[in-house]
Amino acid sequence: MSDIKYKRVLLKLSGEALAGDQGKGINPPEILKVAEEIKEVHDLGVQIAIVVGGGNMWRGEAGAEIGMERAQADYIGMLGTVMNALALQDSLESVGVPTRVQTAIEMRQVAEPYIRRKAIRHLEKGRIVIFAAGTGSPYFSTDTTAALRASELNAEVILMAKNGVDGIYNADPKVDPTAKKYTKLTHMDIINKGLRVMDTTASSLSMDNNIALVVFNMNNRGNIKKVVEGEEIGTTVEGK
């Protein structure tokens, strides 16, 4: 463990990371690839908590835009994250990684309810914990969930795994070829520059609790391991 920079991490995975090229739904071969990457890091002795998004299933904001009540639309999105969490748990356990799912909305037949002390105990015992159903409340993103859970668990860093984007830019690099990549930023830089990395609530929570953020490209094999070993890839956000 002497060559590991981060001992306890929170990995934020988008729902799209589990969908692969198809963009929607659950893609088992793609999830298995993600699980194998996570296993590499787990085998180093790193304690790993995961927050999964649900954008491959549903987005609450999109539901609200077509006339649904926003709270109801958000609850549907939370259920989507539970499906993703169960699929990821299955893949992780298939490669020999003990995994627990905890949900912010109780559904005891399929997962444990979120209990902070129990989650920490799982991590200490070498189990991965996947947090699903967001915060359990509408209007809060899974990015905010990641910042909240990282704060509660005393995680050292949030690993923000992105699809095909290798860090934070001053413009969308997929649209603007002149977009400039940042290698280091502070949390206030994120807020003041209006950089769309995570929402303001999540950024403020991370800043107030002194949690670093590393944004990197999930599509490059081995990147999660590189980050926890301290290799400077992507963009690191830390300090006020």
Curated annotation (Swiss-Prot):
It catalyses: UMP + ATP = UDP + ADP. One of its GO terms (molecular function) is UMP kinase activity. It is an enzyme of class 2 (transferase). It is found in: Cytoplasm. GO terms for cellular component: cytoplasm. Gene3D superfamilies: Acetylglutamate kinase-like. UMP binds at residues 54, 74, 135-142. Its EC number is 2.7.4.22. Pathway: Pyrimidine metabolism; CTP biosynthesis via de novo pathway; UDP from UMP (UMPK route): step 1/1. Keywords: Allosteric enzyme, ATP-binding, Cytoplasm, Kinase, Nucleotide-binding, Pyrimidine biosynthesis, Transferase. The keyword Kinase applies. Allosterically activated by GTP. Inhibited by UTP. Homohexamer. HAMAP family: PyrH_B (MF_01220_B). Belongs to the UMP kinase family. Catalyzes the reversible phosphorylation of UMP to UDP. This is Uridylate kinase. The lineage of its organism: Bacteria, Bacillati, Bacillota, Bacilli, Lactobacillales. The gene is pyrH.
